[in-house]
Amino acid sequence: PQVRNRGTIGGSIANNDPAADYPAGLVGLGATVHTTKRQIPADDFFTGMFETALAEDEIVTAVAFPIPEKAAYMKFANPASRYAIVGVLVSKGKAGVRVAVTGAGPCVKFAADAVAGVKVASDGLNSDLHASAEYRANLVSVMLKRAVAAAAG
């Protein structure tokens, strides 16, 4: 019973739910996932909807994050589940500015174009009973602006 009622960051990222918050944190901060066999940059760890770079005989043992100068995460949550319909993490660190988007598509994504303020296209975004792809594309822009404002704070 105790295991069923508790979650971990490692378990959440290994599951890679496309609407989960942690993947955006890892990608947006440029984290490294440590496993029983290797270290995987977060940009390479999340490979598709509910898929990761983990081998069948590997588990997540730790996650290492560089400390950002500034960062903020904003999400538009599903009111029932609190999962992100769209979540955007913005960070500024030694490696520059990074933007990660979760909930909008089948997998968390490093959004290099968002850094430049390019409008997000709805092609390839999720469309379901919670939000259309077009609405999610608009939400990415809105959440990005809010995250930038919060990080600049």
Label the predicted regions.
Residues P1-G153:
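C-terminal structural segment of proteins
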